[in-house]
């Protein structure tokens, strides 16, 4: 096992033993630091208690503490051993108990007078430092209950939060912040926890967690003025670079040598980092002319461009095709101009962080031109009572359900800053601060069936999926409206297809029965290119809407699961998954599933089970027995 300046883990025959570790050392020459693909902590998991029969009577108290032999330790202490006495390596019993996570011995030694913040070892560290380096959250909690001070620094100038950040112990970072540690605290080397995480931990956490606590992203260290983005580039930490840029990391921030993060990336000839940082500059308009820079800096304007572009493109495609021009060369040049315009808008104004803006714009534009076509092309040709009136009624229902799907709260799990910290402390002190049930971005305990949406960056109760066509997540708060949206949208598209076919029958000369299908397609496309273009759009949307509606109905009715649960069932312990089926604890039969989902009451005939999924943390909730409905 490699040695580092302070700690070592002797794993062949025993538990952790203290030597040296390079954890937190002054980094005075960053140009000498080579990118790392990972960081070896120099630790293994400590061995558990010995389970085989052994003669502990000859063991000294240090070895007995390392292995957690409580009776032997108590025997020696009762015989007069001073629990404050350090061994030949200047390490106390409390240090050994802390690094090996012997909570019962920590309680015992403190009850016998052990000093909770006693310094020891080559690094002059406290037991809390040792427990933090090893990632023993339960030990950190226990020591702090006895008054251990996490703000004390060790011989290398690091407090506990810096150690937890650089070793990737996200739960400990969260607990320390919740207990009052400053998220921007600098160690004696001028490094913040975010800088250490960016340099040492090649995963999304704890960087993501620190960013959620509103850490100062663009703060520079004391000696080199390197920001966290500089340190991430020095380490080749591509995962963290993306997170820092999304959080507003300044690509042009310079250190004492006048170097930006992009300059460091170029020095290391890392193509991915260079491209990513250059894209970030372009997204902020730094490399654009001044008149474009102001527009590009306006996020609301960029969103309007993304929403408005599909309106223009859909119209131009149909308009150019419908022009009375025989030369396809001219039309081809016009289409080339449309393509060039879209490329310019995309490169100059599209914001790829607005994932839903473009699909939402495509949906709104398609429906807008379909309604224009309906009222200006079909209105005089179709029967009002049997066609137009049902179409208008369907449209009202469609607009209502779309609006609710788009703008309703899908089930965002909310908490105040104090509630978040209280949750972290409660989970940590009950041994439940596990990232499988705790969201390191939203800083909340995740209810059952919830999931963090990577697009919206929020935890959603009873999460189904993120739908780009409505620009929102689909969850407990709007899933029923989303089903209504799909249902009425499908009928609207069917009416549109009917209108197109009726128009061709009335206004176009066709010879389908004589010349066949392909000749018919040519005739209707030539007769009215705009109508044919609307027909193609209708068919495209019909296909995905029909498939999605059927899948949703099947999952809701027959399986009792969400799309997320169906795709990730193996990740959840409460699902029984075989090669052919998924058994859901939320499936209560087709009838009951429908009644509960749509909350059917039928004038009191049915009594659906209403569950607040934003606060439901177990699979057990008050259910109505029987077939899923109850006569009242």
Swiss-Prot record:
The active site is at residue 467. It catalyses: L-cysteinyl-[protein] + hexadecanoyl-CoA = S-hexadecanoyl-L-cysteinyl-[protein] + CoA; L-cysteinyl-[protein] + tetradecanoyl-CoA = S-tetradecanoyl-L-cysteinyl-[protein] + CoA; L-cysteinyl-[protein] + octadecanoyl-CoA = S-octadecanoyl-L-cysteinyl-[protein] + CoA. Its main location: Golgi. Residues 1-304, 347-357, 403-480, 551-632 are cytoplasmic. Residues 379-381, 502-529 are lumenal. It is a multi-pass membrane protein. InterPro entries: Ankyrin_rpt, Ankyrin_rpt-contain_sf, Palmitoyltrfase_DHHC. The chain crosses the membrane at residues 305-325, 326-346, 358-378, 382-402, 481-501, 530-550. It holds the Pfam family DHHC. Expressed in liver, testis, kidney, heart, pancreas and brain. Highest expression was seen in the brain. Localized predominantly in the perinuclear regions of neurons from the cortex, striatum and hippocampus. Colocalized with HTT in the medium spiny neurons of the striatum and the spiny neurons that project into the globus pallidus. Autopalmitoylated. Autopalmitoylation has a regulatory role in ZDHHC17-mediated Mg(2+) transport. Keywords: Acyltransferase, ANK repeat, Cell membrane, Cell projection, Cytoplasmic vesicle, Golgi apparatus, Lipoprotein, Membrane, Palmitate, Repeat, Synapse, Transferase, Transmembrane, Transmembrane helix, Tumor suppressor. ANK repeats lie at residues 51-86, 89-118, 123-152, 156-185, 189-219, 224-253, 257-286. Residues 437-487 form the DHHC domain. One of its GO terms (cellular component) is Golgi apparatus. It comes from Mus musculus (Mouse). It is found in: Golgi apparatus membrane; Cytoplasmic vesicle membrane; Presynaptic cell membrane. GO terms for biological process: axonogenesis; lipoprotein transport; peptidyl-L-cysteine S-palmitoylation; protein palmitoylation; regulation of ERK1 and ERK2 cascade; regulation of modification of synapse structure, modulating synaptic transmission; regulation of neurotrophin TRK receptor signaling pathway; regulation of programmed cell death. This is Palmitoyltransferase ZDHHC17. Coiled coil: none annotated. Residues 11-305 are annotated as: Necessary and sufficient for interaction with DNAJC5 and SNAP25. Induction: Up-regulated by low extracellular Mg(2+). Interacts (via ANK repeats) with numerous proteins (via the consensus sequence motif [VIAP]-[VIT]-x-x-Q-P). Interacts (via ANK repeats) with CLIP3. Interacts (via ANK repeats) with HTT. Interacts (via ANK repeats) with DNAJC5 (via C-terminus). Interacts (via ANK repeats) with MAP6. Interacts (via ANK repeats) with SNAP23. Interacts (via ANK repeats) with SNAP25. Interacts (via ANK repeats) with EVL. Interacts with SPRED1 and SPRED3. Interacts with GPM6A and OPTN. May interact (via ANK repeats) with SPRED2. May interact with NTRK1; may regulate its localization and function.
């Amino acid at each position: 096992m490699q040695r580092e300046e302070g700690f070592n883990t002797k794993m062949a025959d025993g538990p952790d033993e203290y030597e040296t570790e390079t954890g937190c050392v002054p980094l005075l020459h960053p140009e000498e630091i080579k990118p790392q693909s990972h960081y070896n902590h120099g630790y293994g998991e400590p061995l558990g208690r010995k389970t085989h029969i052994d003669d502990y009577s000859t063991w000294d108290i240090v070895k007995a503490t390392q292995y957690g032999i409580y009776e032997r330790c108590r025997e020696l202490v009762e015989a007069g051993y001073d629990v404050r006495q350090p061994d030949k390596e200047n390490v106390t019993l409390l240090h050994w108990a802390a690094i090996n996570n012997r909570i019962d011995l920590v309680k015992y030694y403190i009850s016998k007078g052990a000093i909770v913040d006693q310094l020891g070892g080559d690094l002059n560290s406290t037991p809390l430092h040792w427990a933090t380096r090893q990632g023993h959250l339960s030990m950190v909690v226990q020591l702090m209950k006895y008054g251990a001070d996490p703000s004390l620094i060790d011989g290398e100038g690091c407090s506990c939060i810096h150690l937890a950040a650089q070793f990737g112990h996200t739960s400990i970072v969260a607990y320390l912040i919740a207990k009052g540690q400053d998220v921007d605290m600098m160690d004696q080397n001028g490094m913040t926890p975010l800088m250490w995480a960016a340099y040492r931990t090649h995963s999304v956490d704890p960087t993501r967690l620190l960013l959620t606590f509103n850490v100062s992203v663009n703060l520079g260290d004391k000696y080199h003025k390197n920001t966290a983005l500089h340190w991430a580039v020095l380490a080749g930490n591509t995962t963290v670079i993306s997170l820092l840029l999304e959080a507003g990391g300044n690509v042009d921030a310079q250190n004492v040598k006048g170097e930006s993060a992009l300059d460091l990336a170029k020095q290391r000839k890392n193509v991915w980092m260079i491209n990513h940082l250059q894209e970030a500059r372009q997204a902020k308009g730094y490399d654009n002319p001044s008149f474009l820079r102001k527009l590009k800096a306006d996020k609301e304007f960029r969103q309007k461009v993304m929403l408005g572009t599909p309106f223009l493109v859909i119209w131009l495609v149909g308009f150019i095709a419908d022009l009375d021009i025989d030369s396809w060369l001219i039309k081809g040049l016009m289409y080339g101009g449309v393509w060039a315009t879209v490329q310019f808008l995309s490169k100059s104004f599209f914001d790829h962080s607005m994932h839903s803006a473009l699909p939402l714009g495509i949906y709104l534009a398609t429906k807008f031109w379909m309604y224009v076509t309906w009222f200006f092309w079909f209105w005089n040709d179709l029967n009002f009572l049997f066609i137009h009136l049902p179409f208008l009624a369907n449209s009202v229902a469609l607009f209502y359900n779309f609006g609710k799907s788009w703008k309703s709260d899908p089930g965002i799990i909310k908490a105040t800053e104090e509630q978040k910290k209280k949750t972290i402390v409660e989970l940590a002190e009950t041994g439940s601060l596990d990232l499988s049930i705790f969201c390191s971005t939203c800083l909340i305990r995740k209810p059952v069936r919830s999931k963090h949406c990577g697009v919206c960056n929020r935890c959603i109760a009873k999460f189904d999926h993120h739908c780009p066509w409505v620009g929102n997540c689909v969850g407990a708060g709007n899933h029923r409206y989303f089903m209504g949206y799909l249902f009425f949208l499908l009928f609207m598209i069917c009416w549109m297809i009917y209108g197109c076919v009726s128009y061709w029958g009335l206004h176009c000369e066709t010879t389908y029965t004589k010349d066949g299908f392909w000749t018919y397609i040519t005739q209707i496309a030539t007769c009215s290119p705009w109508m044919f273009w609307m027909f193609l759009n209708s068919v495209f949307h019909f296909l995905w809407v029909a498939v999605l509606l059927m899948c949703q109905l099947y999952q809701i009715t027959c399986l009792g699961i969400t799309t997320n649960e169906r795709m990730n069932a193996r990740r959840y312990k409460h699902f029984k998954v075989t090669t052919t089926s998924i058994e859901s604890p939320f499936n209560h039969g087709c009838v009951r599933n429908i009644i509960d989902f749509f909350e059917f009451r039928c004038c009191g005939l049915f009594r659906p089970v209403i569950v607040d999924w934003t606060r439901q943390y177990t699979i057990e909730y008050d259910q109505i027995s029987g077939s899923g409905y109850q006569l009242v």
